[in-house]
Amino acid sequence: MNAKIKYRAALVGCSRMGAFIDNESSDPALSPYSHAAGYTKCERTDLVACSDIRTDVMKIAGDTYNIQEKNQYIDYKKMILEIKPDIVSVATQPEQRAEAVIFAANNGAKAIYAEKAMSASQDECYEMADACIKNNVAFNLGTNRRYDSGFNSMANFIKKGNLGKLKTLVAYCTGSLFNMGSHNFDLLLKLNNESKVTSVTADLTEFIWDSKSKELKADPTGQGVIEFENEVKAYAFNISKATKWDAICENGVVSAIDNGGHFIVRAKNKKYLLDFEKTSSTLNLIYDLVASIDNSKSYLGGIEVSVKSTEIIFGFIQSHLTRSKVRFPFTPLDIKLNRDFKPRTPRYNR
């Protein structure tokens, strides 16, 4: 395929991560950060349309990213059918994510960039995967650390065995499961070379559960243990407000601190430096999707790894509800996230 071809992108959800999170960061290494900014920066994509049920938010996003008014839609389904985009970004909340992803996959999208968490229920997650696989649609989840050059350098360093065999992984600030846990679980999978999960055990707090409807009314926070097929254990804690991670190997430790701003290798009698150029994880994710369309295969991401990290979220919830270890693969309980909250107004300016 001609490497100069440009893919046409359309955005579903024009709020914070969709279009305006760039205004919250002063770190140039993070830019572009939002979906819209990423497509605008990438020379292989054109952002041609957007959709949001809030017309005021959509108009400002359209003005910001030079999207013609006729290509701004309240109804995302109409947008996909009329615009026929190559790439669809779904930057909604998880409660609305599955319907939009499945519709895009079934109606001509070549690739989908979906925000995390992947879905509001485990069944929805599998339905999304089925639609993407059936239609040969490339899929990347917005777990940005997977596409971060620093964390990729860390993962490759561990994989090379410089410090011997990986034994233990620790995340110190797992956060709430759908918002931050989705990032953390995906990163733990990445650092452990995508090894299969064999079980999880979790204890959750801030757990608002409607037993009649079997719905979570808030994003739960908690901690737990993830066991892998290669005998590595990962501990997902909430014991620090600082976002940091340790990879404990036979002969040393690799640490990511300051949310991946710095990486430290501690090894007896040896000095190592993780050498990498800091680049935008959003832009890397989009380039990865473009390569997936070009060559009909997944690279850094894909639907399979997205499903694996989502299963950990629901495994944690199921472990808490049943007060037991959940062994993978498992039959999911009928659990769904269904919050009642008002959308926040994004920050339109720096």
Language-model-detected regions and their locations in the chain:
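Hydrophobic residues in well-ordered beta-strands that form the structural core
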Residues: 11, 113-114, 139-141, 236, ...
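A contiguous active-site-proximal alpha/beta segment in oxidoreductase catalytic domains
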Residues: 87, 113, 118-182
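C-terminal helix-rich "cap/oligomerization" subdomain common to oxidoreductases
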Residues: 1-6, 11, 45, 51, ...
